[in-house]
């Protein structure tokens, strides 16, 4: 093998290594962004319903920590498939823009659903004094009536407005993040100096996916996370 050919092969390996870690950094950033938006929805709920707190000795910080814990379970459900596909593709040398665009659409669709539930939880809790749950699917048989009730109730307008504002901000942030990492990945051909073999990239991919699956499980105990894990005080709102 000539020195020139050897140098070309080394540069290709360098490029793929940095593409892999940039792809991982992008996915972690997207996952973290989702958790930030969900936390903002919780802040809105606390601001709107803080008068419903009955146990004033209970820690609000603990409530938020447990909230992020449960939000991370939901986020991991959404992230596990794009994480596996993107990292395994990058491990074997593919980190194209089309793949990241497809992943963005995946997050847009499922995040919109999750954010909708988070936005609806505030008026739902105010009315029923409990968090939103699967019982809302019973309303789908009365879709027209339910929609009329929601949009005619003026107190819901704020939450509908905030939903679209936060969703739009999330989408814009996702687009800017994707473009930023697109540029970084395109430039990595010229400045990468770290080489990681395909086998090691594959192992790292598997470990990260397993970590995401652990996030879905939510805990290290015999049983996965349950709703009862949220209860830490006598206040229904903080729980």
Where are these regions (language model features)?
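Cytosolic-side transmembrane helix boundary signature
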Residues: 92-94, 165-204
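N-terminal helix-rich structural modules
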Residues: 69, 73-88, 97-107
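N-terminal-proximal low-complexity accessory segments that begin disordered
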Residues: 28-46
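Hydrophobic cores of alpha-helical transmembrane segments in multi-pass inner/ER membrane proteins
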Residues: 73-86, 161-176
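Short, Lys/Arg-enriched N-terminal segments with co-localized hydrophobic residues
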Residues: 1-13
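Hydrophobic membrane-insertion alpha-helices, especially the h-region
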Residues: 36, 201-215
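Alpha-helical transmembrane segments and their helix-start/interface "positive-inside/aromatic belt" motifs
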Residues: 18-33, 98-111, 197-202
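Membrane-interfacial interhelical loops
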Residues: 41-71, 106-163, 184-189, 217-238
């Amino acid at each position: 093998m000539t020195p020139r050919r050897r140098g070309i092969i080394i540069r290709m390996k360098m490029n793929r290594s940095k593409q892999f870690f940039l792809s991982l950094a992008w996915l972690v950033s997207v996952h973290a962004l989702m958790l930030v938006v969900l936390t903002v929805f919780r802040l809105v709920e606390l601001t709107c319903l803080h008068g419903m707190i009955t146990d004033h000795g209970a820690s609000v910080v603990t409530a938020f920590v447990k909230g992020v814990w449960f939000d991370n379970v939901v986020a991991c459900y959404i992230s596990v498939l794009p994480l596996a596909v993107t990292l395994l593709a990058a491990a074997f040398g593919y980190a194209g823009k089309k793949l990241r665009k497809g992943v963005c659409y995946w997050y847009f669709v499922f995040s919109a659903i999750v954010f909708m539930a988070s936005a609806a939880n505030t008026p739902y809790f105010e009315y029923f004094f409990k968090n939103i749950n699967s019982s809302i699917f019973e309303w789908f048989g009365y879709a027209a009536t339910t929609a009329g009730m929601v949009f005619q109730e003026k107190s819901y307008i704020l939450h509908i407005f905030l939903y679209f504002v936060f969703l739009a901000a999330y989408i814009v942030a996702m687009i800017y993040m994707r473009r930023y990492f697109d540029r970084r990945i395109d430039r990595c051909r010229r400045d990468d100096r770290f080489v990681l073999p395909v086998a090691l990239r594959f192992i790292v991919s598997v470990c990260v996916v397993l970590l995401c699956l652990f996030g879905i499980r939510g805990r290290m105990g015999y049983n996965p996370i349950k709703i009862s894990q949220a209860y830490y005080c006598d206040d229904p709102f903080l729980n």
